[in-house]
Every structure is written in structure tokens, then in C-alpha cells.
Amino acid sequence: MFSDAKLIDSKNNAFFKRLVKISQNKEKALCLLEGIHLCQDFLAKADGAQLKAAIFQASALSKAANEANSELMQLYQCLNTSPTILADQLFKQLCDVPSPQGVIFLIEPAQRPLDELLVDKTMVLVDRVQDPGNLGTIIRTVAAAGIKQLVLSSGTVKAWSPKVLRSAQGAHFAITIFTEVDLTVLVNKLKLPIYATALSDEARSLYALDLARECAWLLGNEGQGVSREVLAQATAEVFIPQAEAVESLNVAVACGIILFEQRRQRLAQLASSFYGQD
């Protein structure tokens, strides 16, 4: 049944050794997608990314072959590339979770040139966010809010690392992500207002802003916030009103609040325009 697959059962295999390095983020151009859901999303939505190898866990694949309507088996059968089967002990060395689902894709994410950025359309700019869980949640939130562009500064955690991918739950493939961007240069090229989250005396309340129009949101590092050089070029600084008992919000939580306040205002404007026609 698996005659088209290559079986690897030795830790000394050159391809397996390379996979280990990639799993440790030692090759920036490649990454591993782990789990059925992520791999399905890649096949359905990936734009410009390349599938380099499809890797299956030996025992999981054997079990799936004897199950009706197995998602793992369906994934195996829809591939246009010859799969690789890893012995269980080798497969688990590549996994970032204790209970793997039996499939990993080796992919080369699309590297988007900055000239593809739509400088007059809403986007989120991320300045040196370090926590993978935070970045993954931001990516997922941006996609859920209907925003299509995310720009990551140099010094931001790798967008395609295993923990970021797991937190984002496939949202990478719903938006366009630009990485390693010099924000001090980019912000001068944007043709829309730039709102930076900050807690300064000059900051304006989120709920006092008209957010129905296009804008750029600027989110900063967990401890340091937005860098001074970039912050100085923002149109306005914005804060989220909150109880005094807490000094500040987590950056990913703040991202969700501001993006969905903008979405609420836009939907309200659309509803007003629609019902105002009568």
C-alpha cells in the first residue's frame, strides 16, 4: 500500500539529520508544519509556499490504513509528491507536542517582497514581539478580523517557528506576512494614518477614534513597547481604557481589542449606510 513511500529508520540518515536541524530553527528558509489540521490548511490555502516533503509516522499511518474515512489516510492519498515514512522514535524527535497526529510537512514559506505591500490598505505592524504564543495569537486575530496584511520588524520572533504555527492554528495561510522589515523606513512610505499602542500622556482613547477608514496599527515589544524611532513617526498614540488595578494588557489581547473595535465600527457604518437608503 505504501510502495511509493521512502522508509527511514536510522537516526544517521542525512535527510533525517536535516529535519532535526529544521525543527530546531537552524534553517531560516524552511519550516515544519505539524498535525493534520495545519497540513490540510496548507494544501487548501497556501499561496506561494512550496511543499518540500510530506513525512508520516509509521505506526500512525498503518493504523489509519485500517480505519474508514481516516483524515490522515486522505491526506496521504491526495499528495502529488512521494511521501516519507519515519520510524516512530525518529518521528517523535521532530514533534513539538507530546501526542503527535502522525504527519509533518516540510515547507518553504513564501518570501513576500515588500513592494507587494498595499501601502493604502489596513495592516498591522509588529515591532520586536518576542513570545511565540503572542505572535501566533496576533496572526490568528489579524486573520479573524479580516485584515490581510501583517508586517513583522527585524528582531521579531520567527513567524514560522513551531510554537507560533501552533498558536496561529492555520491563520498563516489566510493573510500575507512580511518579515524582517525595517519599520523606520516603511512607515514613511505608508499612505494612511498610523496608530501606535502606548501608555503615554499624549495617547488617545481607542474609543475616541474614528476607525472606519483604513489605517496601520503598530504593536510593540512585550516589555519595551514600540521603539522610540518608530513611535515618533506614528500619527497618534492610542491606549485602551482599563481598570487601574492592572498596569497594561498583553500585546496579543490588546491586538484583539483594537482590531475588533475597528471591525465593529466598520460594520456599524455599513449597516447605517444600508438602512439609510430606505
Walk through the language-model features, giving the residues of each.
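Short acidic-hydrophobic, aromatic-tinged amphipathic segments that line or gate anion-handling sites
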Residues: 5-11, 82-87, 175-183, 238
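A glycine-rich helix N-cap at a beta->alpha junction
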Residues: 71-96, 178
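Acidic/glycine-rich phosphate/pyrophosphate-binding loops and surrounding catalytic core
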Residues: 96-99, 103-118
